[in-house]
A protein has these predicted regions:
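Cell-wall polysaccharide-cleaving catalytic domain and substrate-binding groove, primarily
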Residues: 1-168
Length: 168
């Protein structure tokens, strides 16, 4: 008996009309607008990115697309937890918010924590650290999965570096 994975190409071929995919996708006049609209609705709006400075919103969006919403969420939650302390001389251990659970769910608690972190730190610094975490993700992925190495340490790190960006 054939396994489901072995039947997949036949199932897909039976459903998809080959002619529908023969033209270059960019030849579809409304495709770019449809894709942009979909990303705005399903990613930008659902993550509530309009509430943040553009540099932060862009980075969150890019990481959600490239790492998945949960992957970006876990790194964001860790970053917020790392900055969850008062700098104003109050007693050691004084937190700004309850530490976040690093479950990858970017909901009201995570977004509120990020707003607090951003109110006390330069947005460029937070974006820089988010990029550091993303870079570490790619290195770890490449170190642990040989077939992915050319992507993980070849091209993907360009997503974490902007040569015109100020480094602190």
């Amino acid at each position: 008996k054939r396994q489901p994975a072995e039947r997949l190409p036949a199932l897909v071929a039976g459903v998809v009309r080959p002619a529908a995919f023969s033209a270059h996708l960019m030849g579809i006049p409304s495709l770019t607008g449809c894709v942009k609209g979909w990303y705005k609705k399903e990613w930008w709006d659902k993550l509530g990115l309009e509430r943040f400075d553009q540099i932060v919103a862009d980075e969150l969006f890019e990481q959600a697309v490239n790492l998945g919403k949960a992957g970006m969420g876990r790194y964001l939650q860790r970053l917020c937890n790392a900055f969850n302390w008062r700098k104003d001389g109050s007693a050691d251990g004084a937190r700004l918010f309850d530490d976040l659970q690093t479950d990858g769910v970017v909901g009201p608690k995570t977004l509120s924590a990020l707003s607090i972190v951003l109110s006390r730190n330069d947005a460029r610094r937070i974006v820089h650290l988010m990029n550091c975490m993303q870079g570490a993700h790619y290195v770890n992925s490449g170190a642990n999965r040989f077939p992915l190495r050319k992507f993980c340490v070849g091209g993907w790190p360009t997503r974490t570096y902007d040569p015109g960006q100020e480094v602190f």
